[in-house]
Curated annotation (Swiss-Prot):
Transmembrane segments: 23-43, 67-87, 119-139, 159-179, 185-205, 226-246, 267-287, 309-329, 358-378, 388-408, 415-435, 440-460
Protein name: Probable potassium transport system protein Kup 2
Cysteine disulfide links: none
GO biological process: potassium ion transport
Keywords on record: Cell inner membrane, Cell membrane, Ion transport, Membrane, Potassium, Potassium transport, Symport, Transmembrane, Transmembrane helix, Transport
Chain's role: Transport of potassium into the cell. Likely operates as a K(+):H(+) symporter.
Cellular component GO terms, alphabetical: membrane; plasma membrane
Main subcellular location: membrane
Membrane-topology descriptor: Multi-pass membrane protein
Entry's localization field: Cell inner membrane
InterPro entries linked to this entry: K+_transporter, K_trans_C, K_trans_N, Kup
Catalytic activity: K(+)(in) + H(+)(in) = K(+)(out) + H(+)(out)
Family statement: Belongs to the HAK/KUP transporter (TC 2.A.72) family.
Length: 643
């Protein structure tokens, strides 16, 4: 998911389709930024992935980490990094951008636009993918920070009772500072993660030299042999192996911030080599001492202050990884709101320089509660690891499906060629998903439950909004008929301009009808204002405004925003002024209708879903704030509607 922490020159990244930097300095800054934001999640996987995978592989040998298990698991991890991350994401999906933006909802919008009418399946896939990300956003901070703090017991066992409380304190602190924005600290993310990758790579060199046979794991036949000879245990192990590639979606999700080339360069020349070396180093350590599987990552470092310093560095790296996921949840929520999948939650901008720097209080509160509950419920990274993976594999499956549509419809490949390209990756993703589903009763139910809840919320909001729109259109008066009637028999006029917000430009806005009914007057100039969300991330300012004069008294104004943008009505209307519309904010009143919803006997949805939709509607942020309209110029008209 997109991670809207402050990054170097995001405008440059998004401005030219694939975000290619034009200068060496700009390219270097974007590459460094991508290391800090994009690769935090996958970069901290060595803390637990190898340990959990070898432990699963050794379940048939009384917990003894045999050389066959170690080499087989290593080979699976290395080739998962090559096939899933390098080939699927770095080589293929980074090319499937939506005007420079990546991520599942951007891909959904691109695929939906390509399919045209009848894209309901695409929308459903997008809803599933977005919903599953929230499960990932809850588990990643809990698992990452907990696994880092657990390194304290490798320094001294006296720290063990304080692991969970300290983890909770760090997580509460992390969520508490979100409202202040990340601009000040984000500049350090890249350098800290660069140090992280350098240290974990260097620490692995000595064990590899001591146990050079670990390099046999580079041969994919060891992975194949392990799967063929270990039956169900091998299949279960795949679920743990997948932990090594969680975070791969971030490569695609953050495409708009950094561009294709910086993300590819960082992966191929820094992140992948460092991860491969570290996993090989952990494998070499366990080959020499099978007992080291208890904590192979931290045992790469000498006992004493060096290991203690590594715990501190690991904690910093996991906080950075958590930050990227948290801000990704904010970004996903904004996209979902703009695409009509969630109600208008309050969105605060935490930076004047970067429009992507946002904070959503409601999401922050819900994530904090869920993350802390997870830590208190599972209490160890090994237990939490069982809950991880399902949401990420589900997202990857959906991404592969929508990627097929884009390759077929947008790239204009034949269906057979598109299927031939995507089918191997989809098969691999489905295999990983099946392996992770075996962990449902061990904790995998958590992301499934969270995902199911979000799917219900998104589907209910989308369905309810559509039913409400259709019902309102039947009840409302056609705008063209009303204008013709008012031109023939005009009521008393008052000076100034009235702007009526409506989602249906063909019908007379409810606020206009109530104004005529109760006040018996009409402004000199009346504007029917409609705000549309495009299937592209951003809209060129030159295409933002569409004006249509429908009578001497009435005109239509349509403002179009991308799904990555925060609507700012006054700023957009300033563009309309340049196009010739005489607009003065001080003589303009904005009329909005506020609906009080009541459940109807036959609404088209079950009774419980009616009540859920009404509850979501009440939680929506005020339209005045969401569209950034000056509150002193707003007149709200209340209406009651049954759905």
């Amino acid at each position: 998911m997109t991670s809207d922490v402050a990054v170097p020159a995001p405008e440059t990244a998004a401005a030219n389709g694939h975000g290619e930097a034009h200068t060496t300095a700009g390219f270097g800054a974007l590459t460094l930024g991508s290391i800090g934001v994009v690769y935090g999640d996958i970069g901290t996987s060595p803390l637990y992935a190898f340990r959990e995978a070898v432990t699963a592989a050794s379940s048939g040998t009384d917990g003894l980490a045999t050389p066959a298990a170690v080499l087989g698991v290593l080979s699976l991890i290395l080739w998962a990094l090559i096939v899933v991350v390098t080939l699927k994401y770095v080589v293929i999906l980074l090319r499937a951008d939506n005007n420079g933006e990546g991520g599942t909802l951007a891909l959904m919008a691109l695929a939906q636009r390509a399919v045209g009418t009848g894209g309901a399946t695409i929308v459903l896939l997008g809803i599933i993918s977005g919903a599953l990300f929230y499960g990932d956003a809850v588990i990643t901070p809990a698992l990452s920070v907990l696994s880092a703090i657990e390194g304290m017991k490798d320094v001294t066992l006296r720290f063990e009772p304080y692991i969970v409380p300290l983890t909770v304190i760090i997580l509460v602190g992390l969520f508490a500072v979100q409202s202040r924005g990340t601009a000040r600290v984000a500049a350090f993310f890249g350098p800290i993660m660069c140090v992280w990758f350098a240290v974990i790579a260097v620490a692995a060199i000595h064990p590899i030299i001591a146990q050079p046979q670990v390099l046999f794991a580079l041969n994919p036949l060891y992975a194949v042999s392990f799967m063929l000879h270990h039956g169900i245990i091998g299949f279960v192990t795949l679920g743990a192996v997948f932990l090594a590639v969680t975070g791969a979606e971030a490569l695609y999700a953050d495409l708009g911030h950094f561009g294709k080339r910086p993300i590819q360069t960082a992966w191929l020349f820094i992140v992948l080599p460092s991860l491969a070396l570290n996993y090989l180093g952990q494998g070499a350590l366990v080959l020499g001492d099978p007992g080291a599987i208890e904590s192979p990552f931290f045992q790469l470092f000498p006992q004493g202050w060096i290991r203690g310093a590594m715990v501190v560095l690991a904690t910093a790296a996991t906080v950075i990884a958590s930050q990227a996921v948290i801000t990704g949840a904010y970004s996903l929520t904004r996209q979902a709101i703009q695409l009509g999948l969630l109600p208008r939650f309050e969105i605060r901008h935490t930076s004047e320089a970067h429009s992507g720097q946002i904070f959503i209080p409601r999401i922050n509160q819900l994530l904090l509660v869920a993350v802390v509950l997870l830590v208190l419920l599972f209490r160890s990274s090994s237990a939490l690891a069982s809950a991880y993976g399902i949401s990420v594999t589900g997202t990857m499956v959906v991404t592969a499906m929508m990627g097929f549509v884009v390759i077929w419809k947008v790239w204009r490949w034949s269906p057979l060629a598109a299927a031939a390209l995507i089918a191997p990756f989809l098969f691999l993703d489905l295999t990983f998903l099946a392996a992770n589903l075996l962990k449902v009763f061990e904790g995998g139910w958590v992301p499934l439950a969270l995902g199911a809840l979000m799917i219900i919320l998104m589907y209910t909001w989308r369905r309810g909004s559509r039913l409400l729109f259709e019902k309102s259109r039947k009840l409302e008066f056609p705008l063209a008929d009303l204008v013709a009637m008012l031109e023939k028999r005009p009521p008393q006029r008052v000076p100034g301009t009235a702007v009526f917000l409506t989602s249906d430009p063909l019908s007379a806005p409810t606020a206009l009808m109530h104004s005529l009914k109760h006040y018996k007057v009409l402004h000199e100039k009346n504007v029917i204002l409609t705000i549309e969300t495009a299937q592209t991330p951003r809209i060129d300012p030159a295409e933002r405004v569409r004006l249509e004069q429908i009578s001497p008294t009435f005109s239509k104004v349509t403002l179009k925003f991308g799904f990555m943008e925060s609507p700012n009505v006054p700023k957009a209307l300033a563009i309309a002024r340049k196009l010739g519309w005489q607009f003065d904010i001080m003589s303009t009143s904005f009329f909005l209708s506020r609906r009080a919803l009541k459940p109807a006997a036959h609404s088209g949805m079950p009774r419980w879903q009616d009540r859920l939709f009404i509850s979501l509607s009440r939680s929506a942020n005020d339209a005045t704030d969401y569209f950034q309209i000056p509150s002193g110029r707003v007149v709200e008209v209340g209406t009651q509607v049954t759905i």
